[in-house]
Amino acid sequence: MIMDGKFGKYGGIFVPELLIPALEELERAFLHYRDDRKFMAELEYHLREYAGKPTGLYYARNLSEKLGCRVYLKREDMLHTGAHKINNTIGQALLARYMGKTRIIAETGAGQHGIATAAAGALFGMDVDIYMGTEDVERQKLNVFRMEVSGAEVIPVDSGSRTLKDAINEAMRDWISNVDDTHYLIGSTMGPHPYPTMVKHFQSVIGREAREQILEVEGELPDTVIACVGGGSNAIGIFSAFMDDDVELIGAEGGGEGIESGNHGATLSAGSEGILHGSLSYVLQDGDGQISEAHSVSAGLDYPGVGPEHAHLMDTGRARYEPVTDTEALRGFRLLSRYEGIMPALESAHAIACLERYAEKPENRGKTVIVNLSGRGDKDMFMVAGLLGVGV
C-alpha cells in the first residue's frame, strides 16, 4: 500500500489476505484518478447535472427565532435520491468504471445508500446487488422497492442482528469471491483502507460548499457545525472543511433507548477500541470482545462501529460526540417539520435534537450553527406515524 491508512492509531487494514490485492488496486486507482482532470471533470458534471450539486445553505429563520441561535441547514436532503449518499456513490461507481469493473455490490441500512448505489449503477450501466438486513428490509420497504425499480437486486440478510453490520459481512464475503469484476461500494467512512479516506474525499464536497456559502452570507465562519454520526460519512464530509479552524464540531449518535439501557448505537459515547469490518476504531462489544447489537430508531445509525477518523477526532478532542435518544430524535423531527416545513430523515433528526440541546445552554445564545441535513424524511413517514400513534 502507498498510504498507511491511519488516523492516529485508528484505521488500517484488517482483512483476509485474499482481499489485499483488491485493496491495493483500489488505492492505486483512487490516488491516480483523484488528480486526473478527465475523471474529475466527469465527476463534477454528474454531481451537478444528475445529483443536484451544489445544495443550498438555508437560513432557518423560524427555527432560529425559536431556539435563539442563527441556524443554517446544509440541504443535502435536496439531492437526487434524497440524501448525501449520492456524492459518494457517483464517485465510487465512476472510479469502478474507470477500473474496468462491471458489477457493484453494496450494503445498506436505512436504504439511502442502496438507492444511491442503484441509481449510480443505472447511470453508468453496471449490475448492482445490494445486501440489506431483513430487519431493515421490513423497516424500509419503500426504499427496497425504489432500489429494485432502479435495476438493483436486493439480497436480504437473515443472520446475526439482521441489520447493517450483517449486511456488510455478507457483502465482504461476496467481494472476496468476485474481486475481478466487482467493486464493493462501501457507503460510509468505515472499512479497511482506502475506504475511509476515499469516502471522505467524495463527501468533502459538502464541507467545501458549506464553508464557501457561510462566508458569503455571514462574512465569517460558524461557531459550531453539527451532524449525525452512524458510520460517519456525512459528518466527516462537512467537518473536513472546518477542522483547521476555531469551529466546534459535534456529532450526534444514535442513543436508542438510552446509554444505561444498553440498547443504543452510541459507539463513541459508550464503546471501546476494537476491530470491525477491516479497521481499528471504536466498537460496541461485550467483555469477551464479541460485537454487540446496536439499536436506533434510525436504521442508518444502528451500526456498532464508527469511522476511524471520528475515533481519532474524539480522542484528540477536536470533535465531541453526544448520544441522542429515539425520543429526542422524534422530537427533533417534529420540531423542524413544525417550524420550517422540512421533514428530516430520522438520522438527520438526531442532529436537530442535538441542536435543540445545544441551544438550551445560555452560553450558546446568538451563536451561528450549521446543521448538516443529511437526508429527507420521506422514507421514515410510516415509521414516524406509527411512533406517534397515527394511522396512515
UniProtKB/Swiss-Prot annotation:
Keywords: Amino-acid biosynthesis, Aromatic amino acid biosynthesis, Lyase, Pyridoxal phosphate, Tryptophan biosynthesis. Its EC number is 4.2.1.20. GO terms for molecular function: tryptophan synthase activity. Disulfide bonds: none annotated. Tetramer of two alpha and two beta chains. Belongs to the TrpB family. The beta subunit is responsible for the synthesis of L-tryptophan from indole and L-serine. This is Tryptophan synthase beta chain 1. It comes from Methanothermobacter thermautotrophicus (strain ATCC 29096 / DSM 1053 / JCM 10044 / NBRC 100330 / Delta H). The gene is trpB1.
